[in-house]
Amino acid sequence: MKTFDDLFGELTRIAAERPEGSGTVRELDGGVHAIGKKVVEEAAEVWMAAEHESDDRAAEEISQLLYHVQVMMIARGLTLEDVGRHL
């Protein structure tokens, strides 16, 4: 099972290596505005799944939200520690 830290490490590596055809690289290249739109979209999908769908579907939507939030963190140059200071 992948952890939040594992995902952040993987996405950081992808951002540095920029493999051809990577969806993460495409999203990063779209910039903060485009990433922000994905975060908002996924947050709405989490809400709808939590209210109207199965636990498994809600978990899937939450995982997608976490992914896009981490892409935003990388785009802004934020680390897990930067965010952790506010928890």
UniProtKB/Swiss-Prot annotation:
InterPro entries for the chain: HisE (IPR008179), PRib-ATP_PPHydrolase-like (IPR021130)
Q: What class of enzyme is it?
A: hydrolase
Query: What catalytic reaction does the record list?
Result: 1-(5-phospho-beta-D-ribosyl)-ATP + H2O = 1-(5-phospho-beta-D-ribosyl)-5'-AMP + diphosphate + H(+)
Q: What is its main location?
A: cytoplasm
Instruction: Describe which pathway this protein belongs to, using the record's wording.
Output: Amino-acid biosynthesis; L-histidine biosynthesis; L-histidine from 5-phospho-alpha-D-ribose 1-diphosphate: step 2/9
* Subcellular compartments: Cytoplasm
PANTHER family per the UniProt record, alphabetical: HISTIDINE BIOSYNTHESIS BIFUNCTIONAL PROTEIN (PTHR42945), HISTIDINE BIOSYNTHESIS BIFUNCTIONAL PROTEIN HIS7 (PTHR42945:SF1)
Q: Which HAMAP family match?
A: HisE (MF_01020)
The record's family statement is: Belongs to the PRA-PH family.
Can you say what this protein is called? Phosphoribosyl-ATP pyrophosphatase
